[in-house]
Regions:
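Metal-dependent phosphohydrolase cores
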Residues: 1-141
């Protein structure tokens, strides 16, 4: 497994953060044997939007327009698989994300930012992956 550079919250708007997160996202997808060509474009708009807009605006736009976020504007089209990959990858590159995907989903459910029905849909996809890749449950993906 690759050693990843970790970033603070203040560093998340930088190109190096985006690059290391992109590497981690694609590595997790490969490790779980679910990599798809569209993963090459993961978060690709962020460094370019960041050249023009402040980070908070880029972050809000990104979450509304990308299927791997709970805030995605078409909830019925969310990609739970990509969300799992993203949350697993975040733990590799952010100091502020110590949780793995299932821990993050439970946290969001408990804080109210994830509905019980969303959690159920997420859990079905996560459980199928965890059955094939037990390391998901052990926080070592």
């Amino acid at each position: 497994m690759r050693t990843y550079r970790k970033f603070t919250k203040d560093q998340r708007s930088t190109f190096p953060y985006w690059f290391w997160h992109w590497l981690a996202f694609n590595d997790v997808a490969r490790e779980l044997h679910v990599w798809r060509p569209h993963h090459i474009l993961h978060d690709i708009e962020k460094p370019f939007l960041r050249l023009v807009f402040p980070y908070k605006k880029v972050q809000k736009w990104h979450r509304l327009h990308n299927r791997h976020h709970l805030e995605y504007r078409y909830p019925e089209r969310r990609s739970w698989l990509d969300m799992i990959i993203d949350w697993e990858a975040s733990g590799r590159t952010k100091y502020a994300c110590p949780r793995n995907a299932i821990e993050e989903a439970r946290f969001k459910l408990n804080e109210g930012s994830m509905s019980p029905s969303d959690y159920t849909q997420f859990y079905i996809v996560w459980k199928e992956l965890a059955d094939r890749h037990p390391q998901l449950e052990k926080h070592s993906v």
